[in-house]
Amino acid sequence: MDFLQGTLDMLVLRTLLFGPLHGYAIAGAIRNSSREALNIEFGSLYPALKRLELKGWIVAKWETSEHNRRAKVYRLTPAGRRQLRKEQSRWADFVRAVARVMKPAPGEVEP
């Protein structure tokens, strides 16, 4: 499924709300939460993670993974939590606006 601009950032922030994860786990969590509807390409995920890090919304630290491998683990910052709240509000507004367009007006007949 294709993403609207900025949607991936919101999904990453939301996923990290529940705790720190490495990139592969972030992609898996989004895929699992969406019941396999959203498959995040790593070519999109890692630039998004870098962008979020540069904005100060997440921080990254190299750690040892559960499989005893080095992995960059990402954590949500307080600024990231605030940004997530803003993004969730914008998303809700967007969904309501699309729903209004998609719902026929009273008396409107589709061709």
Task: Map each language-model feature to its residues.
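Glycine-centered, phosphate/nucleic-acid-interacting loop/turn motifs that mediate DNA/RNA or nucleotide
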Residues: 56
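N-terminal helix-turn-helix DNA-binding core of bacterial DNA-binding proteins
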Residues: 1-46
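DNA major-groove recognition helix of helix-turn-helix
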Residues: 49
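Amphipathic alpha-helical dimerization/coiled-coil segments
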Residues: 81-111
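Short beta-strand "wing" residues that participate in macromolecule-binding interfaces
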Residues: 60
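Basic, amphipathic "hinge/linker" alpha-helix immediately C-terminal to the N-terminal HTH DNA-binding motif
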Residues: 67-88
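Short, solvent-exposed loop/turn elements at beta->coil junctions and helix N-caps
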Residues: 63-64
